[in-house]
Amino acid sequence: MSVKIRLARFGAKKRPFYRVVVADSRVSRDGKFIESLGFYNPMLPKEHELFVKVKVDRLKYWLSVGAQATDRVAWFIKKGIINIETV
């Protein structure tokens, strides 16, 4: 089973809201997931405290046991939007 950390889309039409989830790679984007790690709201400005909110300790755990972050989640980590050095 290949596990990925990815975004699952929620919200209404033209008002996207994403959850950062851990899911099996074979499951559909908005399908069943193992654990919800946080959320991402692209409708808010980047400076807003609720733009991205993630349980950093759980994110570090899943990365340590071999879960792969998708391109977008890896971009958040690389740019420092999700700061994994805080814990």
UniProtKB/Swiss-Prot annotation:
Superkingdom, taxonomy of origin: Bacteria
Key words, A-Z: Ribonucleoprotein, Ribosomal protein
A matching Pfam family: Ribosomal_S16
GO BP, one annotated term: translation
PANTHER family, A to Z: 30S RIBOSOMAL PROTEIN S16 (PTHR12919), SMALL RIBOSOMAL SUBUNIT PROTEIN BS16M (PTHR12919:SF20)
Family designation: Belongs to the bacterial ribosomal protein bS16 family.
Record protein name field: Small ribosomal subunit protein bS16
Organism listed in the record: Ehrlichia canis (strain Jake)
Gene name per UniProt: rpsP
